[in-house]
């Protein structure tokens, strides 16, 4: 195949961009109230620019009661006062642009907060004009104790039933996530129009360049909201994906949203969208340029490997081969199409990648963190880097339940305690699971300095909203890593420079082929672009190992590696060593 057979290589700013994700609560506190804020982000824009990224994606900063850290929005057009003002946000957008970067915001429109005015109206009576903007259903019946039975057997993503009973009108409302995070009914055209105008149009008018679309595969539910088939025989409640994911009108809705954005923007700027679709085989449909839906998607296959499909905190063993195939599934579908892909291994919903997929021991933390950097920077698709990932942040160690903040952890802890007891095997397994997999590992405050107690995130006399990961005392902080040429931070800068220099192969490379796929130590592959070939050899083990050449007699020209004192002509890789070559 030639370049003409690969429409996915058509250049776009959002394909070539490296996008830095910011979790505002934990990034930088500018006013010493213990919470990160928008002015804090603005104060660190030069740091972000110097890293070598091209855009920032800021997680929800909208007004919210914060049941789920801002993903429960009560007003799409207003900044949560703890984060600042609308003017602070407009200033952040403007200064981001002045530094030559794009600004992407989170679009959370599958659900809103029960504190949103739309829901307050809807719940007020069964005849309210906005009643049908949400999913209201009467009880299926009543149990022996007289308690109302939910309308179907769907389980919330956060545990328990996906339905909450509201005594105002004695009906249940659907909420696939937290109890006060109520699902919007996209079947209602007036509801869709209001969502587009308030959540999308308002921010397009103020200059945003794109949206990360939260839970983008959930807007079209299965008609009638029927009971799910029994997939998990250990539970009466069933995972909601069957009834809520990739429903019959999902692509129609995304095309409508795309048209709204295109018609709203009058200055010619190209808006990018990345849809969090999680699972399924529709990725090529979502991202086909000819279908006008979303620019690219986040798939969860590679980051959910090692977890149970029925309960995210049940640890399941997996092999390197399985992980290699899962990672490749993120971009193989675009080969020879007009679709596009993403590459990421961390975000605000995932634990730290070094702990999960490499080696966070003091001996190998840095070198294995750099190995993951090499892997990510060499993969096809738009690259995302999550705050703290660039300094090699790792999971915190052995925290008691009282230190966790995540509503998902708290809900499941209470469910397990009630069902099995505090000292049960199930509870012990749960603690092992959250130690490896909890979202809280990615949400601890950003360590800017080595200074105790708050590492420069907030003032030394301030109590931060969340505990810091103690790793800042072991050198995992921006201040010390900036001065250390051998740090993970400075390696990220070099790797991003290489990704730009070799963008044809690293970003747009096609015809991906595994080398030694069955190896449970070596992750190696080739990619092509016109007459050029990239070869990556990555050792995902603590032992020395020899790699295979991409073809017999191949001549290799070294691009980048994570060991400074290595013989790049040798085919033996040191523990957790990775190298990227051009094949001649």
UniProtKB/Swiss-Prot annotation:
Q: What residues correspond to the site Transition state stabilizer?
A: 349
One Gene Ontology cellular component: plasma membrane
Q: Which CDD domains does its entry note?
A: AmyAc_SI_OligoGlu_DGase
Sorted UniProt keywords? Glycosidase, Hydrolase, Maltose metabolism
Annotated SMART domains:
Aamy
Disulfide links within the chain: none
Does Hydrolase count among this protein's keywords? yes
- Tell me where on the tree of life, at the top rank, the source sits: Eukaryota
The Gene Ontology biological process annotation of the record reads: maltose catabolic process; sucrose catabolic process
- Which catalytic residues are annotated? 214 (nucleophile), 276 (proton donor)
The family annotation for this protein states:
Belongs to the glycosyl hydrolase 13 family.
Q: What is this protein called?
A: Alpha-glucosidase MAL32
């Amino acid at each position: 195949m030639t370049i003409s057979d690969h429409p996915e290589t058509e250049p776009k700013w959002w394909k070539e961009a490296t996008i830095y994700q910011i979790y505002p609560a934990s990034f930088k506190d500018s006013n010493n109230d213990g919470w990160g804020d928008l002015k804090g982000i603005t104060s660190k824009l030069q740091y972000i620019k110097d890293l070598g990224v091209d855009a920032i994606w800021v997680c929800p900063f909208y007004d919210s009661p914060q049941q789920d850290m801002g993903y429960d929005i009560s007003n799409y057009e207003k900044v949560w006062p703890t984060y600042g003002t609308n003017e602070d946000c407009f200033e952040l957008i403007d200064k981001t642009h002045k530094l030559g970067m794009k600004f992407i915001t989170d679009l959370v429109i599958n659900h809103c907060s029960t504190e949103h005015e739309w829901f307050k109206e809807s719940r007020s009576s069964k005849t309210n004009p906005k009643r049908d903007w949400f999913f209201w259903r009467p009880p299926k019946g009543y149990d022996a104790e007289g308690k109302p039975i939910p309308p179907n057997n769907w389980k919330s993503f956060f545990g328990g039933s996906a339905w909450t009973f509201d005594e105002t009108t004695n009906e249940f409302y659907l909420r696939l996530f937290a109890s006060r995070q109520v699902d919007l009914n996209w079947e209602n055209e007036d509801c869709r129009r209001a969502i587009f105008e308030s959540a999308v149009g308002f921010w397009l008018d103020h200059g945003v360049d794109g949206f990360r679309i939260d839970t983008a595969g959930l807007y079209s539910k299965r008609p009638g909201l029927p009971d799910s088939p029994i997939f998990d025989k250990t539970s009466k409640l069933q995972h909601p994906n069957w009834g809520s994911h990739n429903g019959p009108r999902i692509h129609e809705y995304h095309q409508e949203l795309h048209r709204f954005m295109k018609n709203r923007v009058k200055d010619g700027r190209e808006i990018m969208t990345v849809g969090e679709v999680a699972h399924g085989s529709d990725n090529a449909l979502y991202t086909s340029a000819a279908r006008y839906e979303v620019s690219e998607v986040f798939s969860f296959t590679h980051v959910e490997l090692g977890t149970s499909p029925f309960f995210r905190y049940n640890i399941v063993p997996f092999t390197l081969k399985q992980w290699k195939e899962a990672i490749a599934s993120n971009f193989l579908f675009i080969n020879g199409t007009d679709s596009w892909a993403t590459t990421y291994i961390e975000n605000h919903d995932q634990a730290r990648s070094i702990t999960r997929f490499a080696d966070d021991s003091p001996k190998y933390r840095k070198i294995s963190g750099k190995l993951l950097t090499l892997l990510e920077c060499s993969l096809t698709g738009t690259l995302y880097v999550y705050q703290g990932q660039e300094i090699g942040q790792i999971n915190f160690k052995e925290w008691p339940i009282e230190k966790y903040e995540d509503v998902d952890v708290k809900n499941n802890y209470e469910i397990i305690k009630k069902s099995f007891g505090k000292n049960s095997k199930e509870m012990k397994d749960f603690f092992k699971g959250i130690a490896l997999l909890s979202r809280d590992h990615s949400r601890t405050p950003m360590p800017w300095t080595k200074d105790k107690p708050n590492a420069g995130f907030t003032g030394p006399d301030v109590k931060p909203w969340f505990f810091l990961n103690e790793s800042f005392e072991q050198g995992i902080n921006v201040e010390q890593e900036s001065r250390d040429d051998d740090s993970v931070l400075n390696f990220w800068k070099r790797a991003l420079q290489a990704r730009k220099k070799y963008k044809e192969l690293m970003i747009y490379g096609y015809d991906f082929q595994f080398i030694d796929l069955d190896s449970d130590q070596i992750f190696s592959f080739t990619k092509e672009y016109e007459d050029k070939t990239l070869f990556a050899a990555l050792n995902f083990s603590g032992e020395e190992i020899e790699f295979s050449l991409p073809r017999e007699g191949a001549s290799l020209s070294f691009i980048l590696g994570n060991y400074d004192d290595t013989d790049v002509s040798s085919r033996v890789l040191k523990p957790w060593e990775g190298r990227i070559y051009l094949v001649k």
